[in-house]
């Protein structure tokens, strides 16, 4: 039996023998493509190559691509574990031609691999083609020799692929494997095609047309090929099993899942869910995603929590999910070294997330059970699903899973509506960003000269004004200018674009920002003098002070990154950065606040490297060579075949396209200004360098001097004086609280109490106390009376504050939250809470006595009913 590992290697080796360049899998996070949540196909990393935006030094490629379908349009999550072939994470085998070979070669390669390399029986294979693709038919029938009746023409979108509404598109041919007569299902194109007998194993897309906005198509000058074959699916065929979950890789994970959950039934769908989900979670974390309540992090959290729920369902009594990582590394670590490199981070993240979830799941399940008891039909409302998500951290899928097990469904549309309301509520006004890619012809190329010079003579290639290509621009008009060569650095890798001027005979253009679009460098700014025309010769001059300050901050981020790893551990991976002339901001993975001692160690390490005055050296080399040198590749960055390696002594080696100082000593001084959390498992450090670091130190020293002067203290006794003052404040606050309690006790004689049968009703206003004191008094009433309803208010100027308590035994008669609403309506206020306790406030204290009288009537009417 051929193993999954052997099949993966066999595919790569076969296409390498056919002169294909083996390219590593790209990240599950698509670079620079906001249209995709996750990489879901092998062609994603080559999208710009197919579009003609990006050029490669090879025209044939082979990949084994990590893919994920668990969010957005491509979402298989609900089916995972319950069908034979649905997965969140999967591996896509693919071979690609970029204007090289076409239909004859692509079909021949696929047929040879299937029938000769892995020896599938010819009689088990069927193919489909697009109905009008006679060329593909001829290749299959005349060149391959496949019988006509085994070639099925399909006149639908199943056999025609497009990248979008416009752009490259073309027909497909698909190869199917026949599992035999004992499996239900019919041939593709028949009413029974959805059965499992005939399974698609390879899809070959012929990109030969360009679709225009009006729907018409024209031939592409260089047709290309994009193919995909699921590794899990073809492994199942070769291992003679019907379900992907029966292949060697999944069986190892399922056995481990059974071991760590103590499940009794090895065939439980829950074990398949866990085996599938550990792959998705581990690879997402390795690619830099961490659990969160939105975006990709939310998808990861959903998958983790779904796996945990299924573990609990089959018997897991303790944290278990992270225990599958070791087996996953054993199965896939050889093919994906990132699993080995990031194993500690993966395990720590899963442990933390499972601990967090277990704290909330018990309460959430109680709420879920309580809600379904009161259901009038078989549908759980979207409001309840949202409450479980928002309050208890239940992903929608988990609520839907629990509902499905009880024969119920969830109103997903209403849930999504609630999500949209929340999103609108928290949405911040964002800046308007021009889509420069839509403005610039992708063939325009600018040469960057800014590593070695800040001044360059250049020629104007294009001018854009209000999104339109123009021949010239006039004074005081904003525009985008593209040059043939430039010293201006375009924003990239967290470093902001340069500022400066473009000047020539009779004109001056102020550059306010610089961006990239394909291979074009865009100078964005305003013409402040004269007139600028196409083909004008000019001098491009970068402002040196901002550039040098930015370079110092950028170099400091490299030193900081290394220092973080040394002080906090290797898991401290960069998650993002911002570098400009004023400061640096650095985001990294770490699951707790950094102590003052750790910050001091980090600052000390960075400043030691600055004082050492190491030369900052640059080499350009292959990615493989850079990796052998130990260079750090940063999350979220896309690197070319040749990369730029920045070294600072032996301390820091990173791939980087940014600008840097010549010596570490040029950074001057490094000082952390803030540290905090920006997301679950992600911390942010902000820092300053050089003169700004010195000024920051001066500012802090001046604050300390001002504090010493105010307290009449010196360096020796300052801390003791502050401690003494805080102790005095603490004692005085205790005394104030005591006096307020005595005041309330003294007022108790004036508080009106009414007894309705065995129910005590207390409604009163007490001046001169705070809400905490009122709350304590309410608790006192409830502890001394099994049936009490208490409403206490206090006023200060026009303001009213109130606390309401209802004994648990009475909440079926009247709820504290309902009383709060009634009181609020009389005092221009708002309030709410639980059935047994509520509080709030209002802006009209003038008629507090009348308001309390109305509230008392409201209470009496409710309890008498």
From Swiss-Prot:
CDD domains: AlaRS_core (cd00673)
Cellular location(s): Cytoplasm
Protein name per Swiss-Prot or TrEMBL: Alanine--tRNA ligase
Annotated GO MF terms: alanine-tRNA ligase activity; aminoacyl-tRNA deacylase activity; ATP binding; tRNA binding; zinc ion binding
Source species: Francisella tularensis subsp. tularensis (strain WY96-3418)
EC number per UniProt: 6.1.1.7
Function: Catalyzes the attachment of alanine to tRNA(Ala) in a two-step reaction: alanine is first activated by ATP to form Ala-AMP and then transferred to the acceptor end of tRNA(Ala). Also edits incorrectly charged Ser-tRNA(Ala) and Gly-tRNA(Ala) via its editing domain.
Cofactor(s) needed for function: Zn(2+)
Family: Belongs to the class-II aminoacyl-tRNA synthetase family.
